[in-house]
């Protein structure tokens, strides 16, 4: 066994249990929009993050370069509410739960609280994969090194010659997504990877909601284009699904 494969197995397999307790993790991202069709007001969303700890009991986990809260944590559930890349995108990253219903109950409570607050100033969270007012917002990253680094990296697409990359390197500030994490066991982890690899395309079409008004792309899955034809897609391994199913552990590694 090569040294690199040995290290990969040590890093990723040793923590997988034979028969673990099964939990689910969920992350949901949404645009915050100005209901008047204008750009999202940055002061409105920053004020929201100062308000939420007072009413939800969350602690302030991270602040931006100017001291504004950008990530909030519930010490009990470990739920996190944060800005994702830009101040116009809010993310709910839920602590591990036994069922989706547990998460749904907390999510509905958070949403009701937030929508009520935003509604006072004609703003709201909407369920779109692309920010409806992407062309009106300034699409600048949160004033935090991680997000600034990401956006600067995406801008490098304009310096890469001989490639067919799109002209929206700021897309990281206006696309939204969702993630689900499932616990696996040593006996089934490879079967789970293969299964999700096979259903990914169908899932993408069934739940597509990222239609982009800036181009005639004729698709509701523009997020794929944004990722694949950007600096993320320069290396094919960073995008798409696995090219084939894996026969066994050795084949996988």
Regions found by a protein language model. Name each.
Residues 1-168, 174:
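Terminal catalytic/cofactor-binding subdomain
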Residues 125-126, 130-253:
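Loop-rich catalytic cores of soluble enzymes, especially ATP-dependent carboxylate-amine ligases
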């Amino acid at each position: 066994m090569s040294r690199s494969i040995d290290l990969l197995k040590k890093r990723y397999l040793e923590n997988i249990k034979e028969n673990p307790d099964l939990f689910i993790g969920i992350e949901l991202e949404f645009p915050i929009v100005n209901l008047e069709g204008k750009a999202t007001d940055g002061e409105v969303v920053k004020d929201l993050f100062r308000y939420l700890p007072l009413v939800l009991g969350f602690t302030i986990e991270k602040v931006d370069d100017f001291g504004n809260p950008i990530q909030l944590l519930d010490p009990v559930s470990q739920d996190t509410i944060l800005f994702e890349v830009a101040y116009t995108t809010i993310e709910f990253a839920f602590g591990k739960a036994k069922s989706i219903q547990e998460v749904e109950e907390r999510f509905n409570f958070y949403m009701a609280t937030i929508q009520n607050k935003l509604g006072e100033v004609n703003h709201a969270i909407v369920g779109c994969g692309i920010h409806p007012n992407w062309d009106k917002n300034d699409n600048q990253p949160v004033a935090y090194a991680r997000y600034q680094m990401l956006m600067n990296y995406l801008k490098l697409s304009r310096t890469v010659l001989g490639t067919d990359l799109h002209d929206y390197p700021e897309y990281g500030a206006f696309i939204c997504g969702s993630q689900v994490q499932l616990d696996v066991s040593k006996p089934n982890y490879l079967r789970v990877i293969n299964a999700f690899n096979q259903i990914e395309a169908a899932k993408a079409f069934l739940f597509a909601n990222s239609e982009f008004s800036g181009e005639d792309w004729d698709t509701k899955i523009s997020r794929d284009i944004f990722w694949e034809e950007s600096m993320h897609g320069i290396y094919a391994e960073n995008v798409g699904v696995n090219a084939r199913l894996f026969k066994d552990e050795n084949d996988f590694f």
